[in-house]
């Protein structure tokens, strides 16, 4: 296992995809800080480092999908996977070593974003207003979603020997997860009552409209189901973390139901998804015929 990990990390260090992902993460975070700084006078609500710090979270699934499918795809196409098995390594060891390397790579991309955002954001926008323990908690939750996303995409990549097919499948899956996570989150944000407003009558007079029950507001068992899905999906958690602080800033202007961060529930869901995806993928890979 240690030999597999050493070989995997050496290959990761030489991987163009890995370094391009790191560079893209650094440039993207730097660009966002620069844009927010340039808009401080006209759009100050977007210049808060508390919000900018988490903008990476909804995109980490796509970063993870691209790296995993290409990194593992090369192992399939070059015959590296078969060679590992031919020299006596077990399929379980091969699978878990690849998971460890891919998870470490994706976490490195994530923390590159965080480091660049802090290094540029603090001098330009000021220090975050939230406490250090809260930042560390959110970073830990975000890291767990990155690991669970890696486990999901690794399952697809390890079981798809064709590199092109693996890339298409992983990227489409990442987009589907983003759409699903956004759908469940947005559905939970619907307010229980509609906002009050004014109506113009036919005679030109104005009439005040009282708040009405919102037909799209979820309640009862269906709301519990949506909450569970938003927590189970890595993208659902990532959107919750990302929107938490911007939503608080806009709460005086818009009416919505804020989906709050539930640390223990979110962490447990990420761990369960990771364990289930890795165990399922390893069990199937153990019986797969590698061509």
What residue spans do the PLM features occupy?
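Transmembrane alpha-helical segments in integral membrane proteins
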Residues: 63-76, 154-158, 162-163, 270-288
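A helix-boundary/kink motif common to multi-pass secondary transporters
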Residues: 17, 77, 90, 161-162
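Secretory targeting signals
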Residues: 18, 22-71, 96-170, 178, ...
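Transmembrane helix boundary and interhelical loop/hinge segments in multi-pass membrane proteins
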Residues: 68-87, 91
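Aromatic- and glycine-rich beta-strand/loop motifs that create alpha-glucan
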Residues: 1-25
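Alpha-helical transmembrane segments of multi-pass membrane transporters/translocases
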Residues: 2, 208, 214, 235-291
